[in-house]
């Protein structure tokens, strides 16, 4: 299994997380912590804390820590500032985040309850930009600008452990002769005749590394994660001793990377925040049994009805005694009142 298969923090939007899911995963770093932040869209009037990591934004209520939300950077479509109506601050400038997760759009509005502080905007926007500009660490890439003057263009925090000349890429019937790089974050190969014919495979995207027989003889076979397209890539490294040595080295580096991934999001605050575990309140189990059969209530307030081109037809509500816009499938008036209360 690739590291990516277990990674959800930057690729998902989740609500009402457990205390375990609120903790940082290996490779995740807390960059900033902002107290007195209101989740104006979903929990207006509720003072909370916003945590900015290299993978996601976390918000939790200070009064009830199980009221929380996690927004992965890979889900973010747009970040802007807008005027919002806060119960705690009135009309004020707020951070507006539009996201898309599994074809569903959510919007979030966060308001800093400390007047005159731009830190909410600068922190989130800067870290999200750092995430967007460091995708080479995390994404499987074909035909990218990897090589300059026959040398690998190293990423920050990247170190080359081995460079192997005369490696055949077995993606075609004849094979292509090229150069193979093994680093601490990825595998790179490029053709000698045309260095724009290349591939970059981060350890994050590698599902398996094996030696298999092919029509060219024994070859290194790398299978990528399903999220990257499930590629199976073959490389011919001679002699066999060098092939075995390379596979051993790649497996070793992949194991080290899996234990402590390098996601490449490099951003530091002048003031170091406390560890995430010290900032999130442990959820206390009480005697009240919570019915969790219906999960729509937790996130209904965040829906961004982006596909709605016009108002839905009015229908008569016997419960309210007046005409209302027809509700979307799966939602009830009772459920909406529960969110508001």
UniProtKB/Swiss-Prot annotation:
Subunit structure: Part of BBSome complex, that contains BBS1, BBS2, BBS4, BBS5, BBS7, BBS8/TTC8, BBS9 and BBIP10. Binds to phosphoinositides. Interacts with CCDC28B. Interacts with SMO; the interaction is indicative for the association of SMO with the BBsome complex to facilitate ciliary localization of SMO. Interacts with PKD1. Interacts with DLEC1.
UniProt GO MF annotations: phosphatidylinositol-3-phosphate binding
Subcellular location, record wording: Cell projection, Cilium membrane; Cytoplasm; Cytoplasm, Cytoskeleton, Cilium basal body; Cytoplasm, Cytoskeleton, Microtubule organizing center, Centrosome, Centriolar satellite
Pfam families cross-referenced by the UniProt entry: BBL5
UniProt keyword annotations, A-Z: Cell membrane, Cell projection, Cilium, Cilium biogenesis/degradation, Cytoplasm, Cytoskeleton, Membrane, Protein transport, Transport
GO BP: cilium assembly; intracellular transport; protein transport
Name by which UniProt lists this protein: BBSome complex member BBS5
Main location: membrane
TM helices/strands, residue ranges: none
A cellular component term, taken from the record's GO annotations: BBSome
């Amino acid at each position: 299994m690739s590291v990516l298969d277990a990674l959800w923090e930057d690729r998902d939007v989740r609500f009402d997380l457990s205390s375990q899911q609120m903790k940082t995963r290996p490779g995740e770093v807390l960059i900033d912590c902002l107290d007195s932040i209101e989740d104006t869209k979903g929990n207006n009037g509720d003072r909370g804390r916003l945590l900015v990591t290299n993978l996601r934004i976390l918000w939790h209520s200070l009064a009830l820590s199980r009221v929380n939300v996690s927004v992965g950077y890979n889900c973010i479509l747009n970040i802007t500032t807008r005027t919002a109506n806060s119960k705690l601050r009135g009309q004020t400038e707020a951070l507006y985040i539009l996201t898309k997760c599994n074809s569903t759009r959510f919007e979030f509005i966060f308001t800093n309850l400390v007047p005159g502080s731009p830190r909410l905007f600068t922190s989130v926007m800067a870290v999200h930009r750092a995430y967007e500009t460091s995708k080479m660490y995390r994404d499987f890439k074909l035909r990218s600008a990897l090589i300059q003057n026959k040398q690998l263009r190293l990423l920050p925090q990247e170190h080359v452990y081995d460079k192997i000349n005369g490696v055949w890429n077995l993606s075609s019937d004849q094979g292509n002769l090229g150069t193979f790089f093994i680093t601490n974050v990825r595998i790179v190969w490029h053709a000698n005749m045309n260095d724009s014919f290349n591939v970059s495979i981060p350890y994050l995207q590698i599902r398996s590394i094996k030696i298999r027989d092919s029509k060219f003889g024994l070859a290194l076979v790398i299978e990528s994660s399903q999220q990257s397209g499930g590629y199976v890539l073959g490389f011919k490294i001679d002699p066999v001793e060098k092939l075995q040595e390379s596979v051993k080295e790649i497996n070793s580096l992949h194991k080290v990377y899996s234990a402590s991934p390098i996601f490449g999001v490099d951003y530091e605050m002048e003031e170091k925040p406390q560890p995430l575990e010290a900032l999130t309140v442990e959820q206390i189990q009480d005697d009240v049994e919570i019915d969790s059969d219906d999960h729509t209530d937790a996130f209904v307030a965040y829906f961004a009805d982006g596909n709605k081109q016009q108002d839905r037809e009015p229908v008569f509500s016997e419960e309210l005694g007046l005409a209302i816009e027809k509700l979307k499938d799966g939602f009830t008036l009772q459920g909406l009142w529960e969110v508001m209360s």
